[in-house]
Amino acid sequence: MKALWAVLLATLLTGCLAEGEPEVTDQLSWQSNQPWEQALNRFWDYLRWVQTLSDQVQEELQNSQVTQELTVLMEDTMTEVKAYKKELEEQLGPVAEETRARLAKEVQAAQARLGADMEDLRNRLGQYRNEVHTMLGQNTEELRSRLSTHLRKMRKRLMRDAEDLQKRLAVYKAGAREGAERGVSAIRERLGPLVEQGRQRTANLGAGAAQPLRDRAQALSERLRGRLEEVGNQARDRLEEMREHMEEVRSKMEEQTQQIRLQAEIFQARLKSWFEPLVEDMHRQLANLVEKIQSSVATNSVLSTSVPQENQ
């Protein structure tokens, strides 16, 4: 658990440092393994084509086909991101509730930034279409130049948004795959390059500029460590309370079982005391009846023997 806060802190530092970099690569830096990444790549490829501002692009911009296609690609990307985030939430291991909420909030913020910049791009293309219509066939080269500049800026923003979202989803995925303490080593391995990159960027900063950042990072890490330890202690206390409660329930159940057994034995003894006199009385009556029957049979035998002798 203590190593998890360090990984999260390194990811946060990397994201903060990335905001100060003026240059952004033109290619996405991951392989398209997840459906949301594949959907984003389709959006990215289409945007690259739009940025050429070729005659075909100009024609499709005028009839709204470009904005319609971008809308579909945006919705597909956001839908896949939501589905992937939900899948990770269902797989999330026994992470502390505060950690779970913080990870979800960070992913939600990155997702919102990407969606907002996509929406901004679509609105800018719609604005360009309206401006061209207003020009009524006049020279639109200046409009096209401004749009090209804006598209380059938007492309960089979208690239940063996409990479930030991917990094935060990677942290979320690591937590879902490994759980809390059981996943620390695996999270470190998966995010090792990211942590190293953050360290290198921090080291490259000037000593004067880096020291305040290190101080803030140290203070933040101390707060995170203290909070994580507090949450861990609370979880252990809660587990101990549950164990004591279960032991109390078990004792009560054993006591109730013993009482039921004693009551059953008492009831059995009562039944025996009720029915034994009846059985004994029935035995006596049956014995008397048998004795009477035997006596009667003997008497009849004597009488039947004496009658033939008298006739002779």
Curated annotation (Swiss-Prot):
Region (LDL and other lipoprotein receptors binding) spans which residues?
Answer: 150-160
First and last residues of every sequence repeat = 72-93, 94-115, 116-137, 138-159, 160-181, 182-203, 204-225, 226-247
Question: Could you tell me which species this protein originates from?
Answer: Arvicanthis niloticus (African grass rat)
What the protein does?
APOE is an apolipoprotein, a protein associating with lipid particles, that mainly functions in lipoprotein-mediated lipid transport between organs via the plasma and interstitial fluids. APOE is a core component of plasma lipoproteins and is involved in their production, conversion and clearance. Apolipoproteins are amphipathic molecules that interact both with lipids of the lipoprotein particle core and the aqueous environment of the plasma.
Which positions are annotated as binding heparin?
A: 154-157, 221-228
Methionine sulfoxide is carried by which residues? 135
Q: Which family does it belong to?
A: Belongs to the apolipoprotein A1/A4/E family.
The name under which this protein is listed is Apolipoprotein E
UniProt PTM comment: APOE exists as multiple glycosylated and sialylated glycoforms within cells and in plasma. The extent of glycosylation and sialylation are tissue and context specific. Glycated in plasma VLDL.
A GO biological-process term: cholesterol metabolic process
- Lineage: superkingdom: Eukaryota
Where are the residues of the annotated region LDL receptor binding? 150-160
Chief location: secreted
Region entry 8 X 22 AA approximate tandem repeats: which residue ranges? Answer: 72-247
Segments carrying the region annotation (Specificity for association with VLDL) are 270-282
